[in-house]
Swiss-Prot record:
Belongs to the histone H1/H5 family. It is found in: Nucleus; Chromosome. Pfam families: Linker_histone. The keyword Cell inner membrane does not apply. Residues 38-112 form the H15 domain. One of its GO terms (biological process) is negative regulation of DNA recombination. Keywords: Chromosome, DNA-binding, Nucleus. This is Histone H1C. Its main location: nucleus.
Length: 221
């Protein structure tokens, strides 16, 4: 008799490469702390450079780099690729206008739309300040007028009664003094000797002598 065939199931053998990948432990390496930025982003620096230079024909790449070195003290060689990328994207988005050249090579300036927006913002701020100022001035004027009116009223009210009371007694005193000497001057006409002189002609008796001349008439008898 023949032995029955024994069926053997296939055993999966793991490949050595896969086993190694799964068994590799993750090594926790200490992460280096990121150094703090000593300058703002490249996009901001380049935009400020074009904004402050304000060249009519536009600012060239070299002029922008010189500005970044002087203003932010950065290594322009390391940031060269970032500067060029920003210039290209800014021109595509309409943030900057390329006046000369192609790509990152050429001259760049702010578009007219950006300048108009800045002018509009400035003009909007000015009327607000001007509107606030007259209100303060109006408040001050109202306060001044209110403060002045009671002062003037009190001054006029006080002056009128003071003038009346002081003037009346002053006028009454000289009137009493003038009336006092008048009765003293009344006895002066009594002492006048002039009427006595007028009686002197009555004492002239020699004028009666012609009456004695009538005596011869008696002789006729």
């Amino acid at each position: 008799m023949s032995d029955p065939a024994v069926e053997t199931a296939p055993v999966a053998v793991a490949s050595p490469g896969k086993a190694k990948k799964e068994k590799k432990p993750k090594s926790d390496k200490p992460k280096k702390p990121k150094a703090p930025r000593t300058h703002p982003p490249v996009s901001e620096m380049v935009f400020n450079a074009v904004k402050t230079l304000k060249e009519r024909g536009g600012s060239s790449l070299q002029a922008i780099k010189k500005f970044l070195i002087a203003q932010y003290k950065v290594d322009v060689d390391k940031l060269d690729t970032f500067i060029k990328k920003y210039l290209k994207s800014a021109v595509e988005k309409g943030q900057l206008l390329q006046t000369k050249g192609k790509g990152a090579l050429g001259s760049f300036k702010l578009p007219a739309a950006a300048k108009k927006e800045k002018v509009v913002k400035k003009t909007e701020k000015k009327p607000k300040k001007a509107a606030a100022k007259p209100s303060k001035a109006g408040e001050k004027k109202v306060k001044k007028t209110i403060a002045k009116k009671p002062k003037a009223a009190t001054a006029t009210k006080i002056k009128k009664p003071v003038a009346k009371t002081t003037k009346k007694p002053a006028a009454a005193k000289p009137a009493a003094k003038k009336a006092a000497p008048k009765p003293k001057a009344a006895p002066k006409p009594k002492a006048a000797p002039k009427p006595k002189k007028a009686a002197a002609p009555k004492a002239k008796k020699p004028a009666a002598k012609p009456k004695a001349a009538k005596k011869p008439a008696a002789k006729k008898a």
